[in-house]
A protein has these predicted regions:
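C-terminal auxiliary extensions adjacent to catalytic cores
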Residues: 1-15, 19-26, 30-33, 37, ...
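Glycine-rich, flexible loop motifs
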Residues: 1-40, 65-126, 217, 230-233
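An N-terminal domain-start capping segment
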Residues: 42-45, 501
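FAD-binding core of FAD-dependent oxidoreductases
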Residues: 44-58, 62-66, 73-98, 126-148, ...
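Mid-sequence acidic-hydrophobic segments that form the walls
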Residues: 73, 93-97, 112-123, 128, ...
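Well-ordered mid-protein domain cores that form the structural environment of catalytic cofactors
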Residues: 92, 100-122, 129-140, 145, ...
Length: 504
């Protein structure tokens, strides 16, 4: 597994996982070399203690028990636990990193992780506990705990003791051979796995935002020059060009967008004050510029996540080619932490854009087209989308607060051995929350746009792209004339948005 598409197919589509023969060779050579090399040398985590206790030599007869002690003592997570897709992603990332043959781990550990994925056995891993350097020690300890046959897992929808599930499916717990405890725990695999999951949903959010933005431009019969190739190619940013091109593609068959030359360049206007807007509001007109920055950020973040996913994030690093063991800090999560902070900022930007577009639709003083709150009932007696706007505004505000960076919130710990840490897992977890919030706001926007389409009676004039998602939404959420309890519809719309397939 070397690219993001493979990651998605395994994590979300339950594609079976196997260790390639070349990887098996590298894994075995690395293990055999380290086992021989470490016999008369001081190797961190093999014959020493860990962290600030590394100055203590561990007797040969205690070295295997040391690994069990590490796993059990660091299985100390708390709070909520990660969902199945995040844990699968974390297992896959750890498996992939250790398969590079740079960790001196026994192949049994890697094969057992493959078995967890293939049997859809999900270890119980808690959200709280990771500081992002020495990797995701606490969270990955819970993975290692399951691999040695202890702890708890989710299997077939139930939370159960690992030992019971292993017995049921015929798996044997991992036996420690050399340094499997440290190698399983000492890396960035939870934050990287969650980062990959976050990216999966970030792509969906971006595509939906482009679709909703184009739909609103249709509703208000915008001029098409603000997403034209000529205007957007005048700037050098790839993302802006891609978003503008996507808007043109989506709107190619729309009967509602207009050419400025047909209306404002005719020389027929003699008014001093124009009743019609000469230019659309920024939330409609500046979509390529706003979402272009989001597009480029997501693309860059995906590259960094792919690189980390295919990196040996362990310590020490075993190099068979030079016959050496190198001690350093490849477990440090700075790359992922920084990228997750950037990703949550641009997802919050998506949320802010959606909230402003929603406000535009709900306020007749600025859209000059729709009834207040897109109310299809009796004004004053019915409320339309008034109630859900509060939810959208509140959720957007929460995202704005959550977008403060984790990357700069290092707190020294481990007797100051870890005197600067990445907080990468916290960053990825907060980003996950921001993404979930964004889906809630976009669900409200989607329902509101659909209401506006029905009120205007313009369905037949819309682009095929807008009609397609409108039809999909209407299978879940009806046209609302009378006041209804809204929260079930919001959840249905959110589920629809999250389940959509993404193709850029």
């Amino acid at each position: 597994m070397r690219n993001y598409k493979d990651f998605i197919s395994i994590v979300f589509d339950n594609k079976q996982v196997h260790i390639p023969s070349e990887d098996k060779k590298n894994i075995t050579e690395s293990y055999d070399f380290l086992k021989s090399f470490a016999k008369n040398k001081i190797i961190y985590g093999v014959n020493t203690g860990f962290g600030s206790m590394a100055q203590y030599r561990i007797a040969e007869e205690d070295q295997l028990q040391l690994q069990y002690n590490l796993i059990r003592s660091h299985s100390a997570g708390s709070g909520d636990y990660f969902d199945e897709e995040t844990v699968r992603a974390a297992i896959l990332c750890r498996l992939n990193s250790l398969s590079l043959g740079k960790s001196g781990v026994h192949i049994e550990a890697i094969q057992l992780m493959c078995d967890l994925l293939n049997h859809q056995i999900t270890p119980l891993i808690f959200k709280h506990g990771g500081v992002g350097a020495s990797g995701d020690l606490v969270q990955l300890a819970h993975l290692a705990l399951v691999l040695i046959g202890e702890g708890e897992v989710f299997y077939q929808g139930k939370r159960r003791p690992t030992a019971d599930v292993f017995a049921q499916v015929g798996l044997k717990p991992l036996q420690i051979h050399l340094r499997e405890g440290l190698s399983l725990m000492n890396g960035t695999s939870v934050m990287t796995g969650l980062a990959g999951v976050n990216l999966h949903y970030a792509h969906k959010l971006l595509l939906w935002t482009v679709k909703f933005s184009t739909a609103i431009n249709e509703l208000v019969q915008s001029y098409d020059d603000h997403f034209s190739a000529e205007l957007n190619n005048a700037k050098q940013h790839n993302g802006q060009k891609e978003i503008a091109n996507l808007m043109r593609t989506f709107l190619a068959d729309s009967k509602r967008t207009r050419k400025r030359a047909d209306h404002l360049y005719t020389g027929e206007h003699q008014e001093t004050v124009f009743k019609e807007k000469v230019q659309e509001y920024y939330s409609l007109r500046c979509v390529p510029q706003i979402l272009g920055a989001v597009y480029d950020t997501i693309a860059h973040t995906q590259r960094i996540v792919e690189e980390e996913l295919n990196s040996a994030n362990d310590n020490p690093i075993i190099d068979v080619s030079t016959q050496q063991v190198y001690h350093g800090g490849n477990f440090h999560g700075d790359y992922i932490s920084l990228e997750m902070d950037k990703l949550k900022i641009v997802i919050t930007r998506i949320t802010m854009l959606a909230e402003r577009q929603l406000n535009y639709l709900l306020n007749p003083k600025i859209n000059e087209l729709l009834p207040p709150f897109v109310n299809a009932g009796k004004l004053g007696f019915n409320f339309g989308m008034q109630g859900v706007q509060f939810t959208a505004t509140s959720t957007t505000a929460e995202n704005q607060t959550l977008s403060n960076p984790m990357y700069v919130h290092s707190i020294p710990n481990n007797n100051d051995n870890q005197d600067i840490v990445s907080m990468g897992t916290n960053a990825a977890t907060l980003t996950h929350k921001v993404i979930n919030n964004a889906f809630e706001v976009l669900a409200i926007e989607a329902i509101t746009i659909a209401q506006a389409i029905d009120i205007l009676g313009c369905y037949d004039e819309l682009s095929a792209t807008t009609r397609a998602w409108y039809d999909l939404l209407r299978q879940q959420v009806p046209f609302l004339k009378d006041d209804k309890v809204m929260y079930p519809y919001l959840e249905k719309a959110k589920t629809m948005l999250r389940a959509a397939q993404v193709q850029f």
